[in-house]
Each structure stands twice: as structure tokens, then as C-alpha cells.
């Protein structure tokens, strides 16, 4: 049995499994997951091991609220292209790296971090990831990924990422993924905490780029941004969106009424 099979291919009952999620999430109710941490750290840091196994070890460590996992995420975010596993997982829609989206998923859940006293480091790992939002692809996760407390801690970093992204769009820089939609997703997340700010961020993006996909994602702000800003934003979307967007906006406005 390989080291990977022992650590992530065997459930906590000692049975082989081909579903790594059985192990990743089984750890939340199984203190014995701590016994696997030293081996996972060694696997993650071993250049002789396959990149996919090193990456999944990092995902496991971050999911389990381990210091080594969060520190690895921060290192990866500091120099994305040099990460050993960069481009090992590629998004089908845009044919770009999707490892940071998976790492963001791993960092988002803070239950074990609270238990292990690593919450501050978890937030720093989340900060490092959010700072990549204008340059790396996060699938469609950033709108709903982080809890409100984490979002508050990251608010300045989110604003800076959106600022950089808008400047990039204005300059006509070409990325291989849908940056405007990703920025709108961030604005949508912010709108739960600060409706006016979230709407302002989204409007800055839409004034530069407003594809049907971006507008469709922007609809979430209509119900998330409490107060008149959400309704005003919905009325704006009615003037620029297609039939699908308009129907979704009217539904959202109806719920908010």
C-alpha cells in the first residue's frame, strides 16, 4: 500500500475507499485524523511524490485546520505558477488552473480551525487567496464561500482585488477566464455585509464589462443588498439585462418587497 493510500485512500474504519471526500470530511467527527497529519505533511513536501498526491495532502491539511496546510496555501498564493501542482487540475470551461478554487474550498470551513486554535492563520490563508481574485480562477465560488466574519476581515483585500481587476479590464488585459463575473461574485459576497459598497463594486465592473453571464451573476446582489441599494441595482439590471436576467431580477425584487 502506498503512503497516499494509507493516508487518504483508507477511511477511519480502516477500509479502502476511492472517494477521498469520505476521508476529508470524515475527519470532522473523527479525532484519529490527527494521527495522519505528520504523514500528510511529509507527503505534501516530498518532491518525489506525484503532484496530485501532494496537492490532495495540502487540501486535506487545510480542510482539517492544520497549520502546515494553511502555510502551504499562503506559499502557493505568493507564487502561483511555481506551485508544484499548478495546472494539474484544469477547469473544463476555461481550460485554466482550478487548484486555487479547491484550496479556497478547503480554507473556507473554519470549524476545525476554531478547535485547533488556527483560526487566525486560516484567515491569513483566505486573505492570500482573495488577493489572487484578479489573476487566478476560482470557478464560481467567491460569492458564497466565506462566512461573514471572514469576509469582514478580508474586506480591504477584496476591495483592492476588485480595484486591480477593474483596472485590468479598463486596460484591455486578456485573461483566460471570466474575470468580470468573478469580480461581481466578490461584490455579491460583500453586499451581504455592506449593501452600498457591494453595489458600488459591482457597478464599477459592469460599466466596463457586462456580458450576459456577468449580469446573471449580478442578480444575486438584488436580494443580498438590503435596503434601497438592492432595489435600485435591480432596476438598473432591468435596463441592461436580457429576458432571463430580467425575469430573475423581477423574482428577486418580488421576494424583497
Where are these regions (language model features)?
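Eukaryotic acidic, Ser/Thr-rich intrinsically disordered low-complexity regions
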Residues: 1-18, 216-257
Amino acid at each position: 500500500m502506498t503512503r497516499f493510500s494509507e493516508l487518504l485512500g483508507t477511511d477511519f474504519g480502516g477500509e479502502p475507499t476511492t472517494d477521498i471526500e469520505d476521508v476529508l470530511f470524515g475527519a470532522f467527527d473523527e479525532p484519529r485524523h490527527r494521527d495522519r497529519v505528520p504523514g500528510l505533511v511529509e507527503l505534501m513536501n516530498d518532491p518525489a511524490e506525484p503532484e496530485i498526491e501532494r496537492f490532495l495532502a495540502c487540501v486535506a491539511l487545510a480542510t482539517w485546520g492544520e497549520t502546515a496546510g494553511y502555510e502551504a496555501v499562503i506559499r502557493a498564493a505568493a507564487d502561483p505558477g511555481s506551485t508544484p501542482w499548478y495546472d494539474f487540475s484544469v477547469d473544463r470551461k476555461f481550460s485554466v488552473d482550478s487548484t486555487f478554487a479547491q484550496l479556497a474550498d478547503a480554507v473556507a470551513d473554519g470549524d476545525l480551525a476554531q478547535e485547533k486554535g488556527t483560526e487566525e492563520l486560516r484567515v491569513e490563508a483566505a486573505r492570500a487567496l482573495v488577493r489572487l481574485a484578479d489573476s487566478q480562477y476560482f470557478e464560481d465560488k467567491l460569492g458564497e464561500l466565506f462566512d461573514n466574519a471572514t469576509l469582514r476581515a478580508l474586506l480591504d483585500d477584496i476591495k483592492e482585488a476588485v480595484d486591480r481587476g477593474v483596472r485590468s479590464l479598463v486596460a484591455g488585459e486578456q485573461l483566460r477566464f471570466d474575470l468580470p463575473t468573478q469580480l461581481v461574485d466578490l461584490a455579491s459576497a460583500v453586499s451581504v455585509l455592506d449593501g452600498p459598497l457591494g453595489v458600488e463594486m459591482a457597478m464599477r465592473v459592469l460599466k466596463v464589462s457586462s456580458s450576459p453571464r456577468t449580469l446573471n451573476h449580478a442578480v444575486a446582489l438584488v436580494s443580498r443588498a438590503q435596503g434601497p441599494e438592492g432595489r435600485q441595482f435591480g432596476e438598473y439590471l432591468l435596463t441592461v439585462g436580457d429576458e432571463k436576467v430580467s425575469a430573475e431580477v423581477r423574482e428577486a425584487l418580488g421576494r424583497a418587497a
